[in-house]
Amino acid sequence: MAEQVTYHIPALLNECMTGLDIKPDGTYVDVTFGGGGHSREIVKHLGESGRLYSMDQDMDAYANRIDDSRFTFVHGNFAFLKNFMRYYGVEGVDGVLADLGVSFHHFDDSERGFSFRFNGHLDMRMNRNAKHDAAWVIA
């Protein structure tokens, strides 16, 4: 397992697991992997044939990946979920989790440009490879 860094503490973790009603042989997607808290809990409930695909467009999340054969990290925006699932040969899923919003990780990193606490460039991109940052949008 990759070393987990302090990134984000998942909110409503137990409620999310109850809502997903995870089947041991099910296929699940976490479209906002981030720190991996929700995904780690999903994997705990999967049997040998269960699968979890976790997406994030922020490559910082890759450092939190889970070293488990039932887990696949997908670098991308969940707007392309259908394309990614087709790529991996997934015909249907049993549940999708989306923990939308900004994590503490983004506010605590002055280079990300999400916080008013730091002097810095107004970036605010979840995907640092995106063409335009927030400063460009408001200019």
Indicate residue ranges for each PLM-predicted region.
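S-adenosyl-L-methionine-dependent methyltransferase catalytic core, i.e., the SAM/SAH-binding region
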Residues: 1-139
